[in-house]
Amino acid sequence: MDYPAQRDFVKELAVTCRKAGLGLFIYYSVGIDWHHPYFLPNTMYDPARPHYKEVPESYRFRNVEDFKHYLNYAKTQIMELCTQYGPIAGIWFDTVGGVYQYSELFNIQEIYDMIHQIQPHALVVFKTGANGNEDFITGEREMGSLAPVFKSVGLPKKVQDAADFSWESNNEKPAELNIPIQALGWAYHTSSRQRQKS
């Protein structure tokens, strides 16, 4: 283990889920990685990186070919999740905007195929869909294409069209709606307006 905690939290979660008779469903952020040196820069996809005054030296992305380093890293992690923790119920991918904009770089179907080859029973989901081949869909606060959201923040028409296509391909599949219990949205907030700490 090459991380500070020196614990395998996924293993602990997998063991606990098995003991409780629950399936292990893993969240994986393939569409944004603020730490990997070869992830897309925010000049290519605005939310891809924080807006630093100066780009950290650790960010090494220089051209599109560099992205293969990130993708190999992500595939290796996903393969590890599918092979090291016993049966998994599924993987929920996030965030989808960059995948829509650079579908040829992400090649998400290859990742889906790898998961289904290793864990044939595992469900794969990516919001309301990254390519229309998801096993079910998840909406965030509401169901529908993400195209209006992407249009409102000025993302290219290609992204909006991909969002519409994925929604149309998936909208009759089983669905799950995700709603934060916090007024301020997802994750921990220190604001006095925040009562729940989820």
Outline where the language-model segments fall.
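Mature catalytic domains of secreted/periplasmic carbohydrate-active enzymes
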Residues: 1-198
